[in-house]
Swiss-Prot record:
Result of changing W292L: Decrease in activity
Substitution effect: H479X: No effect on thermostability
The UniProt record lists the keyword Hydrolase: yes
EC number(s) stated in the UniProt entry for this protein: 3.2.1.1
Thermal behaviour (record text): Active up to 100 degrees Celsius.
Catalytic activity, as annotated: Endohydrolysis of (1->4)-alpha-D-glucosidic linkages in polysaccharides containing three or more (1->4)-alpha-linked D-glucose units
Official protein name in the record: Alpha-amylase
Binding site for Ca(2+) 2: D190, A210, D212, D231, D233
Length: 512
């Protein structure tokens, strides 16, 4: 009898442990779906408050299933208002008085470190933006012998050699030699686009230099993009940028990187750089590269040249979304996955709808129209393949051209984030069998309570589709988490249901 009582007491203790110590919801489960957020848009105010905004938002992000954020370039640019892509001093994270300011557009180094600490406390990873193609805002000019090249064919020289004054000397008067004593001179670069002595904008290649050849072959050779182009054939440069990468990761306790403008940077160096930082930090350092080309073959070539050691943004999928949103219902929705990275290399695809370059007024403007954005987010957030990214500008709205600003769509994206966090698990079944209405289902996973879903999107008229969600879900009543449809769906004994969607809309059905 005493033994039975002791056994009962132990079982009771174990039961309480299970109740209070195990995760209370799917959100805390070990297999929580990963969701990345790009936490900025191009026209963020130059108020120095962005790192504080990020810190204050950390609880909200965690609640809605965001597991990682990509922060904007954290280092000093050409001015305080620089978005960060005119990189001046990679070691100044808002700490030194340079370019007329201590803080960057986003705030100070200390504020950023506090924000990252807050994110980490909520199990949100932080990916730093890496801008290492060029340097802008040099401290002084240098006399350099150079030739002009044809902008349409960078391999074709169109002038004789002559002297120019190039902005290529970086000595960082505010920082000095803190963190690094490396000073940049003309011979650390391949070329530039400005001759200060003649006030001429041309593409100049420096004497004795050659464009890096492991780059995109657009314009003959697309090594040169802007400012002073970094020469990765120079061993001192390669060593310094590797050293900086390790410092950057350790100084901010980063968990990964977003690599900017990789089609202009020597591919083998990027491969080696990622491997080097991973080795030195002892961390996985998830890395995604921005290779901007609507061409699966070009992206596959990059993945191959970098030994598939990091991911790429699925640019072709973005352009499919853009096309679908602009063709007035004439787009064939069955083709959404055609020639996309996620269809060929799902483990290397970061899927997205829009970003700071595609938003209105920007260099790669190809904005997905507002009505289609919820459909696109349902597509990337509730399917099994790809690592989806949510854009700050879609959640909170964008600024810039007041006639073309993106409105805040948080109220429409939140239910889709909830669907990803709590329901988008298990085997997937696709129904890409109609020009307008396409759908997919997830059967759910026994380790995530009440999981499973059925999603429909259409760029044309509304309608219905009979879809299979698994016999294990028979008898359940499902409802549309987006609120777009009000009628419930009862799953039949064979695991099938008939799901409806409104015209030009999305519906995601989950267990009530």
């Amino acid at each position: 009898m005493k033994q039975q009582k002791r056994l009962y007491a132990r079982l009771l203790t174990l039961l309480f442990a299970l109740i209070f110590l195990l995760p209370h919801s799917a959100a805390a489960a070990a297999n929580l779906n990963g969701t990345l957020m790009q936490y900025f848009e191009w026209y963020m105010p130059n108020d120095g408050q962005h790192w504080k905004r990020l810190q204050n938002d950390s609880a909200y992000l965690a609640e809605h299933g965001i597991t990682a954020v990509w922060i904007p370039p954290a280092y000093k640019g050409t001015s305080q208002a620089d978005v960060g892509y005119g990189a001046y001093d990679l070691y100044d994270l808002g700490e030194f008085h340079q370019k007329g300011t201590v803080r960057t557009k986003y705030g100070t180094k200390g504020e950023l470190q506090s924000a990252i600490k807050s994110l980490h406390s909520r199990d949100i990873n932080v990916y730093g933006d890496v801008v290492i193609n060029h340097k802008g805002g040099a401290d002084a000019t240098e006399d350099v012998t150079a030739v002009e090249v044809d902008p349409a064919d960078r391999n074709r020289v169109i002038s004789g050699e002559h002297r120019i004054k190039a902005w290529t000397h970086f000595h960082f008067p505010g920082r000095g030699s803190t963190y690094s004593d490396f000073k940049w001179h003309w011979y650390h670069f391949d070329g530039t686009d400005w001759d200060e002595s003649r006030k001429l904008n041309r593409i100049y290649k420096f004497q004795g230099k050659a464009w890096d050849w492991e780059v995109s072959n657009e314009n003959g050779n697309y090594d040169y993009l802007m400012y002073a182009d970094i020469d990765y054939d120079h061993p001192d440069v390669a060593a310094e940028i590797k050293r900086w990468g390790t410092w950057y990761a350790n100084e901010l306790q980063l968990d990964g990187f977003r690599l900017d403008a990789v089609k202009h940077i020597k591919f083998s160096f990027l491969r080696d750089w990622v491997n080097h930082v991973r080795e030195k930090t002892g961390k996985e350092m998830f890395t995604v590269a921005e290779y901007w080309q609507n061409d699966l073959g070009a992206l596959e070539n990059y993945l191959n040249k970098t030994n598939f050691n990091h991911s790429v943004f699925d640019v072709p999928l973005h352009y499919q979304f853009h096309a679908a949103s602009t063709q007035g219902g004439g787009y064939d929705m069955r083709k959404l996955l055609n020639s996309t990275v996620v269809s060929k290399h799902p483990l290397k695809a970061v899927t997205f709808v829009d970003n700071h370059d595609t938003q209105p007024g920007q260099s790669l403007e190809s904005t997905v129209q507002t009505w289609f954005k919820p459909l696109a987010y349902a597509f990337i957030l509730t399917r099994e393949s790809g690592y989806p990214q949510v854009f700050y500008g879609d959640m909170y709205g964008t600024k810039g051209d007041s006639q073309r600003e993106i409105p805040a769509l948080k109220h429409k994206i939140e239910p889709i984030l909830k669907a990803r966090k709590q329901y988008a698990y298990g085997a997937q079944h696709d129904y890409f069998d109609h020009h307008d209405i396409v759908g997919w289902t997830r059967e759910g996973d026994s380790s995530v309570a009440n999981s499973g879903l059925a999603a429909l999107i259409t760029d044309g008229p509304g309608g219905a589709k009979r879809m299979y969600v698994g016999r294990q879900n028979a008898g359940e009543t499902w409802h549309d988490i987006t609120g777009n449809r009000s009628e419930p769906v009862v799953i039949n004994s064979e695991g099938w249901g008939e799901f409806h969607v409104n015209g030009g809309s999305v519906s995601i059905y989950v267990q009530r």
